[in-house]
């Protein structure tokens, strides 16, 4: 039978429930348990696909094409289990499902209410995410409830998991509550009162935490832990200190050394092998002992919030570990770059990356960036929109297609080298159609799709014959312009197996040492253990350029 760990949060948001949940999952996985994670988001959006990155951070895409919370990226980077659309759902998704059932008459004329209909639906979604009753059922499902205890939006989720825990029995579920202890500099002490109040709020709705993860900017002394235990009815060994660390991969060791996994296994009566976190220790050591450094300019439009590019940032760091260098990432606002000052802004970097994005703002700065990288032989990786701007730049300045553009930015362009594809086939074989007036939510090419890679290319050296990567985009390279671009020297290095859509473009090695644009999002499949072959190669090229410029090791 699947056991459940419910993770809640209090006092303030952004305490790191996702990292804490993923770290606990990693520890339990090291004990030989099959683990998954489920994220419950209290907002009314059906999914985060149409939300601004400035509000929500990046949208993480799964193999099956779900647009999900960025915490699922943490989950996949910390454990072996791959996420899918069942691992993340929102209030909007729940209400959508309930209303569809009501319209079908599934409730047999009853008055549809939050209790029991909405709370029952939440429980069904949780069980589905854990694979209960199926061959893919897991030993432990860690359920992270978004938001903060006390928020009205989270109440149906908290009530649902309270009911679920009661029904399952004491040894089949447990509650872990993440809280915050502020340091008051003028008083010179940590304050426990907010933690006391948030646990009290949790108890008011019928939930007693079995463990408290106490976030602070420093270790919590034993005296404060004893005080918290007394006022929250949590045993002192269940009051876990979670202080700020410089590397998130230190968190599993931190939690294990304070006995969190032992407490969970005892509560759930799980007999496991001993914990082995050696690979996490090795990972931290590799991170802390690089043999050099490279600096990468990430030129985008959402640079004011680094979480907008969370997976890209992590993929670059993973590749740094594989190449034994520390990767310094400078986020550069593309609106601040034009052709006249590109050299002044970009010359000092070892490599340039242009990530995905939507909308016209900052696009000309990205095009200028791609041109500078091409003309100055600076390693360039363009992801999604980054591939499209590289294609536009090449069309304008090499292929002689004046004013070439994407119809996303200029519907009247004389040379729409990037355009909206109106019909395509999903991973499940179903035909999808869209146009300029289609709904924005859920209408993109999404999820994992396979492409054939052209032999003899840089992409082939990196990937081999076939590449399978995740997608999230609405516009494509226009097939009508592929031949003129090829004749001008642009290499179309990979095409989708079904629709023959452009997936990878690159410059020939005779023209540029490392210049690749990809329509997909490779960052979603990078892990700290292996990195990702494309990012690994990109950082290797950055390292080689750094060594050539400085005539010594990076």
Swiss-Prot record:
Residue ranges of every copy of the Glutamine amidotransferase type-1 domain listed in the record: 295-548
Binding locations of CTP: 13, 151-153, 191-196, 227
Entry's transmembrane regions: none
One Pfam family cited in the UniProt record for this chain: CTP_synth_N
Record region (Amidoligase domain): 1-270
Biological process according to GO: 'de novo' CTP biosynthetic process; pyrimidine nucleobase biosynthetic process
Pathway in which the depicted protein is active: Pyrimidine metabolism; CTP biosynthesis via de novo pathway; CTP from UDP: step 2/2
Protein name: CTP synthase
Species annotation: Verminephrobacter eiseniae (strain EF01-2)
